[in-house]
Amino acid sequence: MEYPRSEVVINRMATTEITSQNHDQSVADGIVLLDFWADWCGPCHMFAPVFEGASEKHSDITFGKVDTEAEQDLAASYGVQSIPTLVAYRDGIPLFSQAGALPAEAVEDLIGQLRALDMTEIRAEYEKQKAAAEGR
């Protein structure tokens, strides 16, 4: 007897919407890539499949999308003046920011570099810079 084939569809959201409310928690741990975009932005639509593809390939990384129209204050806090803008964090430390639609190879290269970082050194330098900025 042949049974009808059932198809199971797993709805896995590969990217996360980042808002002012979930931003700090979202960038706190691990590697995080943020894509600042807007619906009216042509280059943003060209970059979207690259970003989505990387998110599906690297499930251990948080891929967040920031709608600059809905989250104007958040975009302003990053100084975003051109979109798309890609921002990278590791363990809560901002490490990279670049405007423009990057090709897939550049995104993969960035991910490789983020994975290879010695975070002990990075944390020490980050704390030193933070203390200097606060006048300590």
Name each region found by the language model.
Residues 41-44:
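Short cysteine clusters
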Residues 6-25, 60-62:
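N-terminal "domain-start" segment that seeds a small globular fold
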Residues 32, 72, 78-87:
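Structural micro-motif
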Residues 28-39:
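Short active-site neighborhood of thiol/selenol oxidoreductases, capturing the structured segment around
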Residues 31-33, 46-66, 72:
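Conserved helix-turn-beta segment immediately C-terminal to the redox Cys motif
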Residues 119-136:
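CheY-like receiver
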